[in-house]
Amino acid sequence: VSYLLHYAVFNDNVNIAILANKASTARDLLGRLQLAYENLPKWMQQGVLVWNKGSLELENGSKILAASTSASAVRGGSYNVIFLDEFAFIPNHIADQFFASVYPTISSGQKTKVIVVSTPRGMNHFYRMWHDAERGKNEYIPTEVHWSEVPGRDSVWKEQTIANTSEQQFRVEFECEFLGSVDTLISSAKLKSLVYDEPIKRNAGLDIYFEPIKNHDYVLTVDV
């Protein structure tokens, strides 16, 4: 929120979109930004043209929109910063539709920034984005905030939190574990040891990860 506010105040005529899995969550984030704005020194504040639960417009021409993440959320607009909150909780098909709709707008601006923030929720589209970012396969920069970096949180706090919730919930919400956030037949530890790789070839829906080796025996398992 602080970065978005700084960007809007110190840059003229910029458009910022705050999108979340629910419209109420996006409006809550905008509300925090508005509260931060009210606490800025008077010399730093711009004149306000629009101030409501869904949008903010400053005298320097900068605008901030709050809405739910959908394919039509920012269609037709031009944005300098798009902030996506709790992106892992967006259904896969909506996330795919969103980027298919918005990416032309994102790629048209040389300085357009996309900030994706989320708690892990299993091995879904957000996991794929994060894993690819770690391996340098996309242009995102992975940044993890561990619970121990928050002032006042220590081992005692950890033990109390686990006692009041569960170890699995703690791993997901605070340890940023992608596995364990969904119930699986196979243990999380085993799944975590597996590696996600891109296929070496794709052909009409057939993904090939390894070339067959001559005179080797292979076993095929099919889940129907």
Regions found by a protein language model. Give the residues of each.
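Catalytic glutamate of the conserved HExxH
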Residues: E86
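Walker A/P-loop NTP-binding motif
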Residues: V1-D12
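ATPase catalytic-site recognition across NTP-hydrolyzing enzymes
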Residues: Q97, W147-V222
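Conserved Walker A/P-loop ATP-binding site and its immediately adjacent core
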Residues: N13-L35
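Inter-Walker segment of RecA-like/P-loop motor cores
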Residues: R27-N80
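Walker B beta-strand of ABC/ABC-like P-loop ATPase nucleotide-binding domains
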Residues: I82-F83, T221
